[in-house]
Amino acid sequence: MWYFAYGSNLNSRAVAEWCRHYGYRAPAMRPGKPAVLDNYRLSFPIFSEYWAGGIGDIVYDPGKYVMGALFDLSENELNVLDAKVNRKLDSNSKEIGTYKRIEVKVSNLGKSDSISAITYQGISVERYHIPPTQHYMDLVIQGAYSFGLSMMWIAYLQSFPLQQGRKPRPPGTGDAASKL
């Protein structure tokens, strides 16, 4: 199953570190291929106590795009990412956590065909900007570099206002979104 990563999940080292800390087997996160999600934009409307700032989300916005990477993951590997992003289901299979899975069409960079993929979108309806921390954005930008995403996209990532003087909390502390 294809998975489209666009935020801190672009950084496989950060995903592996989270998995190690919380006792999960890290997803293989290979092969990663640069990809584009059209008609969405990147935003930071979700506050995480762990990161001490905003964390990435996608918002439907015709004419905009989000760059990221495609990974071929098993359902078990996606379940690990579900735990990482705090995706939860109630007894009626309604998504009630911080993020929900959505199916999207993404373009593999350099190829014209679209691929169906799973990605995560925040459940919160609040859509104002919560500045991320420098540490969080560094992880996102390192992930973007590792997949050869465009310098224009990296400059865009660097343009977001950041939290000043706040440090991320140690793993295992904070709110329900602290695992993010």
Where are these regions (language model features)?
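Glycine-aromatic micro-motifs
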Residues: 1-180
